[in-house]
Amino acid sequence: SPWPRRVSPFLVPSSIINMISGHVSIKFGFKGPNLALATACTTGLHAIGQSARMIEYGDCDVMVAGGAESTVSPLGMGGFAAARALSTRNDDPATASRPWDKDRDGFVLGEGAGVVVLEEYEHAKARGARIYAEITGFGLSGDAYHMTAPNVDGPRRSMQMALQNAGINADQVDYLNAHGTSTPLGDANETNAIKLAFGDHAKKLVVNSTKSMTGHLLGGAGGIESVFTALAVYHPKSPPTINIFNQDPDCDLDYCANTARDMKI
């Protein structure tokens, strides 16, 4: 028979994405809103942004939010390689992820997770919590354009919506942790979107891609990059974008090339 003789009783539960957050809630006794998102590379960031809004709306006082991914496998590597999304600089893997460099040729697949504890401000103060940073605004959008090809309108609107939600002007932003995947189309598109969203102030921004050091964590990217951003605000210091050896003239912003920078954020 072509059919399996036995199916595990754990087959269905193990394939439901929100079982992950369910296990966390059971382990720690979390009884507030419990949900899981799956929005590809923005999963972690969407989870954090939506959790912040739940706190803002009064649905809860504390949320644990972020993203994780483990895709370094024959199937994961093969799929992205077939899509020609990965760098082929296999003879020099340490410099293969090079966002905004003229010779970038794709991203490096990474694995990992980034999770933050979000807490209502007065609640955090009352228990003497160490506060690393504050989420003041969140924006998300779609460009209704193409399944994989980038478009400037979607990210532009997302950034402008975050500014509007935060109630601040573009010139009040000092630092931007960008997507910066090291793909030829994506990095140029993101640069143009930043310039459209921030106008003349874009040239004064410090923009960096921590993917130059971690690789692309896919669903975990937004989580770990939110951690990096919070720590950049807390210390205050911009992480570098490493491996910029020959900056692409079409990517003409300040990417904090190769060296971390002390700065007010």
Predicted regions and their residues:
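Flexible, low-complexity linker/loop segments at domain and module junctions
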Residues: 166-172, 202-203, 254-265
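Conserved small-residue
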Residues: 24, 44, 51, 80, ...
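Condensing-enzyme catalytic core mediating Claisen C-C bond formation in acyl metabolism
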Residues: 91-166, 174-175, 244
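Acyl-CoA/ACP chain-elongation machinery
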Residues: 61-105, 138-152, 180-187, 204-254
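Short glycine/serine- and small hydrophobic-enriched flexible loop segments
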Residues: 52-53, 119-122, 227-235
